[in-house]
Amino acid sequence: MNFKYIVAVSFLIASAYARSEENDEQSLSQRDVLEEESLREIRGIGTKILGGVKTALKGALKELASTYVNGKRTAEDHEVMKRLEAVMRDLDSLDYPEEAAERETRGFNQEEIANLFTKKEKRILGPVISTIGGVLGGLLKNLG
């Protein structure tokens, strides 16, 4: 009789433990689903904010380029434009060293600068947006 009692109690304990483990797994999976949903919502909000910032930066850069291309320039504007040309050459030399040397020998005209501005927008905006994303992510993490 003792042996049957020990086996029955052991079986009950094992089945209770198995049910407990199963409930824990379900609970964890439900928490994972909820966490994933909240992360998706946060990412969606972050994506919308970054999209707005990106659009604003693109507009500002295009406006700046069109101002320098179409408008009359003062001496100060001319200096800014020369610095911009130097920055563009430096960026080109980092990305495409063989083409940069070729461009430096023939100089820049206003149309080339405007074209470079739009080509470089994506290359310049990438790190800027990732930095902004990191800052926003840090803020959201601190708020949460």
UniProtKB/Swiss-Prot annotation:
Biological process according to GO: defense response to bacterium; defense response to fungus; killing of cells of another organism
Tissue expression:
Expressed by the skin glands.
Q: Does the keyword tRNA-binding apply?
A: no
State which residues form the propeptide: 19-43, 74-123
User: According to its UniProt record, where is this protein mainly located?
Assistant: secreted
Q: Where is the signal peptide?
A: 1-18
Residue numbers of Leucine amide PTMs = L143
> One Pfam annotation, family name?
Bombinin
List where in the cell it is found. Secreted
- List UniProt keywords, sorted A-Z: Amidation, Amphibian defense peptide, Antibiotic, Antimicrobial, Cleavage on pair of basic residues, Cytolysis, Fungicide, Hemolysis, Secreted, Signal
- Provide one Gene Ontology cellular component: extracellular region
Q: Which domain of life is it from?
A: Eukaryota
**InterPro entries the record matches:** Bombinin
Q: Which residues carry this modification: Asparagine amide?
A: N70
Instruction: Return the similarity comment.
Output: Belongs to the bombinin family.
In UniProt terms, what function does this protein have?
Maximin-2 shows antibacterial activity against both Gram-positive and Gram-negative bacteria. It also shows antimicrobial activity against the fungus C.albicans, but not against A.flavus nor P.uticale. It has little hemolytic activity. Maximin-H1 shows antibacterial activity against both Gram-positive and Gram-negative bacteria. It also shows antimicrobial activity against the fungus C.albicans. Shows strong hemolytic activity.
Protein name in the entry: Maximins 2/H1
Task: Name the source organism.
Answer: Bombina maxima
Q: What is the lineage of its organism?
A: Eukaryota, Metazoa, Chordata, Craniata, Vertebrata
